[in-house]
Every structure is written in C-alpha cells, then in structure tokens.
Amino acid sequence: MVEATKKAFVTGHPIKHSRSPKIHGHWLAQHGIDGSYEAIDVAPQDFAEFIAALQANGFRGGNVTIPHKEAAFAVAQRRDQAAEEIGAVNTLWFEDGVLRGGNTDGHGFAANLDDCAPGWANTGPAVVLGAGGASRAVIQALKQRGFSDIRIVNRTLARAQELRDRFGAGVSAHGTAATDELLADAGLLVNTTALGMVGNEGLAADPALLPDHAIVTDLVYVPLETPLLAAARARGLKTVDGLGMLLNQAVPGFEHWFGVRPQVTAELRALIVADLVPKP
C-alpha cells in the first residue's frame, strides 16, 4: 500500500505574505519527502470549522499565525509548556489522535541567538521593547535561559504591567520615559515592536547608551538591517537580525509532521533573503 502524501499547512488572515511554504518546501525537497505544506487563508469566523476538518482533509498538523494563535490555544486538546506560559499556539499536530498545540516562537528566538551570538544568555539584564504577543514569546525564552532581570518597555505601561504580572519574578514594567536609564547596564536589547519595518522607520531606543558588551536583536526582518540594528552596528555592538527566528521556529513543526528534524543552513537563509527583495 502506498503511503499518502504527508500534508501540513500554515493558516492566518491574511496569509499570502508568509514565507513558511518556501521554508518547508526547501526541507521537503532536501529530504526527499513526499509531502506538502500550503498556505490557507482562514477568516476568524471560519477557524473552528477549519480545525475540525483537519484530519478528514488529511492534514498531520500545521502552523497558525495572526490572528489565530489564541484560538489555536483554546482548541488544542494538549499544550506544551511554552504554549501555556505564552498563552498562544503557533504549531498544531496530531499525536495518537489527540490535537496537540505548541509554541515555537521562543525556541526560534533563542536558537537564532545561539547561532549568531554564542554566550548571549550571560550578558546581563535584558531590555525588551514592546508588550505584544511577540514580547511574550521572548520573555518566556529569556526566563527559560535563566535571565533574572527582564525589563519590559512599552508606550502603554498597563500592557507591560500585564506581562510583568503574567511572568512574575525577575520581570519589571516600564514606560518609554525610562528607556535611556534602563539601557545603561543592559547586556541584551530586543525590539519586538513593528518600529523599524519598511514604512514604519524609526528608533525605539538609542543603542549608543548600551555598554560595549551588549547584544542588540530585532524581531523585524524586512528590512534585514533595521534602523536599530544599523545604529547598534555603527556603535560597534554585536547585532542579530530577526530572520533566524523565523527559520528556527519552523524546525519543531516540520519534525512533528514529517518525522525528520531539519537544519537551518546558510543555503536556506539565502533562499529566504532572496525572497525578501522586492520584485520589480
């Protein structure tokens, strides 16, 4: 009997911008797997119906992105520790007939820094700019790696305070007026906001205020070098762009669906970098 094609998906609304099919398609071809990974646009009101039909439609699981991560958290019958701590699911898979949910964003964040800035977890206090969903994943990863002084900076202080209360000891909340003071002894600066994206240029913090040993990373990857990273590089600081987080967060899901743990390679990165360049 010929085994059916292994199927996975990424769903969001909208979803046509997703680079995930290119990432997983590269790995499927590399490993010679008879599989598929498709982008499916699902409106919020149709999400529950979409999930209910996954097995009937032959899917082993898939990725979930904005705006469905909280809905995926609710529908998963079992959730991993990261998903519980973050309160959102970005990866779904079936195991013994049970729909399981995980969150690989924190893994992607930490693995990117492991690859590009070895020793990053021993640099001192971390300043996290922003208090949205991405910030939750970053804080979860930082706590897992042993950070005991995590400073959330957000324009709306109440949002930062919510995350402080969620993650507890070692996490503090601050308004943007405190940014300069917080940077003075920080070893890691993380931008989780949209500031720096194409069309939303600007600096959320001044890297010139950081110590010489500090590392600066930006979750934005379009452009690859944001104004924040450019300023940090000009200051002589170690910088890490956000593309590696996207690539590394995809690894656990691929293993769940297709049975092989793929590698994030220079070849894969080059493939996605080429796709980031605007088409004429």
Swiss-Prot record:
GO terms for biological process: amino acid biosynthetic process; aromatic amino acid family biosynthetic process; chorismate biosynthetic process; shikimate metabolic process. It comes from the Bacteria. One of its GO terms (cellular component) is cytosol. Pathway: Metabolic intermediate biosynthesis; chorismate biosynthesis; chorismate from D-erythrose 4-phosphate and phosphoenolpyruvate: step 4/7. The keyword Manganese does not apply. Shikimate binds at residues 18-20, 65, 90, 105, 221. CDD domains: NAD_bind_Shikimate_DH (cd01065). The keyword Oxidoreductase applies. It is an enzyme of class 1 (oxidoreductase). NADP(+) binds at residues 130-134, 154-159, 219, 242. It catalyses: shikimate + NADP(+) = 3-dehydroshikimate + NADPH + H(+). Keywords: Amino-acid biosynthesis, Aromatic amino acid biosynthesis, NADP, Oxidoreductase. This is Shikimate dehydrogenase (NADP(+)). Involved in the biosynthesis of the chorismate, which leads to the biosynthesis of aromatic amino acids. Catalyzes the reversible NADPH linked reduction of 3-dehydroshikimate (DHSA) to yield shikimate (SA). Belongs to the shikimate dehydrogenase family. The active site is at 69 (proton acceptor). Pfam families: SDH_C, Shikimate_DH, Shikimate_dh_N. GO terms for molecular function: NADP binding; shikimate 3-dehydrogenase (NADP+) activity. Its EC number is 1.1.1.25.
